[in-house]
Design a protein with these regions (language model features):
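Aromatic/acidic polysaccharide-binding cleft in carbohydrate-active enzymes
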Residues: 184-238, 242, 288-290, 294-295
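Acidic-aromatic substrate-binding/catalytic surfaces of carbohydrate-active enzymes
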Residues: 33, 40, 317, 518-520, ...
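The substrate-binding groove and active-site-proximal loops of carbohydrate-active enzymes
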Residues: 27-39, 64-84, 120-129, 155-160, ...
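Non-catalytic C-terminal accessory domains or segments of carbohydrate-active enzymes
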Residues: 232-493, 497-566, 573, 586-587, ...
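N-terminal carbohydrate-binding accessory modules
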Residues: 18-56, 640-651
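Aromatic-lined substrate-binding rim segments of carbohydrate-active enzymes
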Residues: 42-112
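Active-site region of glycoside hydrolase catalytic domains
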Residues: 91, 95-181, 197
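Acidic, contiguous internal or C-terminal segments within carbohydrate-active enzymes
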Residues: 141, 713-753, 773
């Protein structure tokens, strides 16, 4: 009994199961226009999408973005801008085993000239040379050739063979993550069991300077910020992604049940509540009831649906729905391999989930234990039809709980507690039988990239341990050491090029039968962050950490810099840290830092300028011991009482921004969009400075400008105009002067939290802007 409880605890506490090895047939994709994100964010955000359950990303390929300056040269490798590295992006998708849904032809949403190069007729037939260029590039990257490109949209009739990949399934339902009805609309699409579901506005978008549609936004907010923080609007995507991890493979084999509509057990559905049922074309696989409450009233009733396996109606008792809530309720879901659980071979054809009043996302069976994962916005229950008495015990949310078993009907009722988190997830596990043989992983949670990781396994008998083997992902290796008759430790080597945050699936097998599984996240040995680095702001609430970090420093007194170090390893680590950079002294010059397992530590470095001139200076942090890293960074030396003019590519689009900065404020300008003023930030406002400009900035125009830096000033030259911007050295006053009338802007004197913006327009060609605390 004790071993059975240990097996149950290990299985019930497991992380959510990985998606099936084969990609789901029902396509749920997220729009991911690579050119709208700094390249430094691609890996992080794609790993996040994969983690929540998204396997397909959709994106256009802007013709005028890759045909550099409208000439004959194309950039697909990032030679002119990191965001043009289309091949690198495709390779990243391939490494993550994700799929691409590409749109090779204009129009490109929100993009300059709809994506057409200047002077090219906006006609799809004119795009034949462009398609030919892409075909040569992308043909080896289709799924047919082992690549990630699964779908090509829009080339039919122009180059129908480009490249060798099908069009996405129709109809395509497009849902914005910002839509208050996103959950309802997405579930209505799933209830048809046809086509594809495409999510927009999931990620913050940042247009390269000068490439947004004239008058269009430079920054577009999504459900996930540029810093990786999830906003509440991501909840609908998360729930659908979790649902379709396994249901997605069943949907193409299902059809709407029209002969027996879903209704209440005692009457019609109330106004604002709709319900429909999907049933499997093959008997005894799975059915589901999709119910949507669009009313303002809570719903709590018993539903009557059709059981296609038994060929009679079935009552789903006590269904709870909050206002504007949806549920996907399982009905007659097989516990055998034809249902959601591909490896549940221990169940007969008669054993199935009769129904559940929470969303069933995952079913797993190993070591005699049946585990199910639900999305349960409210307390719920599941009813199982078995062919035997379950041995028990039952765990719900990691806690022992009672379950009801009817000896006559062999039915089990399981109480499901309300779930937690944005997707209301809860995991339950019921021991069905004491296994004849069992094997499991002992507290395995993470693997460190580039290291040999100890993974401990336990077995019910010495003979089973001797016959077992560890199944690993491609590129991994393992060396076993028998620590006891019933235990084996594996030294699992993770490839050095594995991606931080990705996942690896391990399994214990004996005689070809999987006995235990582990879904482990991959981590670098250590993560290093410099929180004092500047951020590029868009309005008052959005910002982007600049990479590599740029840290302002007093050119005389220096400053203290925090280095945040997270030990990702499950063991204590010691790090040797050595900063270096010409023109600066570092105290201490060398440091040794001990960090506990999975623990954050902060190292304080005191930096003293030693001959460094005003402006940008490179420096580097070198780590050895617990990890080997070189972290490049830059200092911005600012003399007291002076303003410094400097330039750097802050948003990773290949075009530098121009900055005026003193000890108090920072003003950022674009060399595109007529010298658009992007940011005016009071630097000492917590947590990352306060920008008083709107997301669209000010002085926006069209076209590139020439920029010259002087002593605390920037000079912008456009067609038939010249503008000079000066920042005072000692205070927060910015003066703007132009030889023609200044572009219209909407800035007004007013308070922004604790900072007041003062606006003074002396004439049509002169204006002054000051920040006062």
């Amino acid at each position: 009994m004790r071993r059975l409880l240990l097996l149950l605890l290990a299985f019930a506490a497991a992380l959510p199961a990985a998606a099936p090895a084969a990609p789901p047939d029902f396509v749920q994709a997220v729009e991911f226009p690579y050119y709208l994100y700094p390249q430094t964010l691609w890996e992080r955000e794609l790993v996040w999408l994969k983690t929540v359950g998204i396997r397909t990303v959709e994106f256009s390929i802007p013709w005028n973005w890759h045909q550099v300056d409208g000439g004959a040269e194309f950039d697909f490798t990032g030679a002119t801008s990191p965001r043009r590295d289309l091949l690198g992006f495709i390779r990243l998708l391939r490494r993550l085993e994700m799929r691409a849904w590409i749109r090779p032809l204009p129009p490109v949403k929100g993009w300059l000239n709809n994506g057409y190069p200047p002077g090219v007729r906006q006609d799809r037939k004119a795009a034949r040379p462009w398609l030919h260029e892409l075909e040569n590039l992308l043909a080896p990257q289709t799924e047919k050739h082992g690549g990630p490109i699964a779908f090509v949209e829009g080339s039919t009739g122009i180059n129908p063979g480009f490249p060798d990949a099908p069009a996405p399934p129709l109809p395509v339902t497009v849902v914005s993550a910002h839509d208050p009805a996103a959950m309802t609309r997405s579930r209505q699409a799933l209830a048809t069991a046809a086509g594809a579901l495409l999510w927009e506005d999931v990620e913050d978008a940042l247009f390269p300077a000068g490439w947004e549609r004239p008058g269009g936004p430079l920054y577009r907010a999504g459900a996930v910020s540029l810093n990786g923080d999830e906003r509440p609007t991501v909840a609908a995507l998360r729930r659908n992604a979790a649902l379709l991890r396994h249901w997605g493979a069943l949907l193409p084999g299902m059809k709407p049940e029209r002969a027996y509509p879903v209704r209440l057990a005692a009457g019609k559905l109330p106004p604002g509540v709709t319900a429909s049922e999907l049933v499997s074309r093959a008997p005894g696989v799975a059915s589901a009831v999709s119910i949507v409450n669009q009313s303002r009233q809570p719903f709590q009733h018993t539903l009557r649906a059709w059981d296609p396996f038994a060929k009679h109606s079935i009552e789903i008792e006590n269904v709870h729905l909050a206002p504007h809530e949806t549920l996907w309720l399982p009905v007659n879901v097989s516990l055998g391999g034809a249902g959601l659980c591909r490896e549940c071979t221990a169940f007969s054809n008669a054993e199935h989930i009769v129904y559940a009043t929470a969303e069933l996302q995952t079913v797993e069976f190993e070591n005699g234990t049946l585990a199910m994962e639900f999305s349960a916005p409210a307390p719920a229950e599941a009813v199982l039809q078995l062919a035997r008495r379950p041995s028990g015990p039952y765990l719900a949310g990691g806690h022992l709980a009672e379950f009801d078993f009817d000896e006559k009907t062999l039915r089990v009722r399981l109480k499901i507690p309300q779930g937690k988190g944005p997707a209301s997830q809860i995991r339950v596990a019921l021991a069905i039988e004491a296994p004849e043989h069992s094997a499991f992983f002992e507290d395995a949670k993470r693997l460190i990239i580039g290291r040999a990781n100890t993974v401990s396994t336990s077995y019910s008998s010495e003979q089973l341990a001797d016959r077992s083997r560890l199944r690993l992902p491609e590129g991994f290796a393992a060396t076993p050491t028998k620590k006891s008759p019933l235990g084996i430790d594996y030294a699992v080597d993770v490839p050095a090029d594995a991606l931080h945050g990705d996942w690896a699936n391990l399994a214990i097998e004996a005689d070809g039968v999987p006995l235990g599984r582990a879904h482990l996240q991959l981590f670098r040995p250590a993560s290093v962050h410099l929180p004092d680095g500047i951020r590029l702001h868009f309005g008052a609430t959005a910002d982007l950490a600049v990479e590599p970090a740029i840290i302002p420093i007093d050119a005389t007194a220096g400053r203290t810099v925090d280095v945040n170090i997270r030990n990702n390893s499950p063991e204590i680590q010691t790090y040797a840290i050595e900063p270096s950079g010409d023109g600066f002294q570092f105290l201490p010059p060398k440091s040794e830092l001990n960090s506990g397992a999975v623990m954050d530590r902060v190292l304080e470095l005191r930096i003293f300028p030693d001959g460094a001139a005003p402006g940008l200076h490179d420096w580097v942090l070198r780590f050895s011991g617990g990890t080997k890293l070189e972290i490049p960074a830059r200092f911005l030396a600012i003399p007291r009482g002076q303003a410094v003019a400097w330039s750097a590519d802050l948003d990773g689009d290949g075009s530098p921004e121009w900055i005026l900065e003193n000890q108090k404020v920072r003003a950022v300008f674009s060399a595109q969009d007529g010298g658009r003023w992007l940011e005016f930030t009071w630097k000492d406002s917590a947590p990352n400075g306060l920008n008083v400009l709107p997301e669209s900035g000010a002085f926006a125009g069209t076209g590139a400008v020439e920029v010259h830096a002087g002593d605390g000033a920037l000079e912008f030259t456009g067609k038939d105009w010249k503008r000079t911007v000066r920042l005072a050295g000692a205070d927060a006053s910015l003066a703007v002067e132009q030889n023609t009338p200044l572009p219209a802007e909407t800035l007004e004197t007013g308070k922004h939290n604790e900072i007041t913006l003062q606006v003074s327009r002396e004439s049509a060609t002169h204006a002054a802007y000051a920040l006062v605390k």
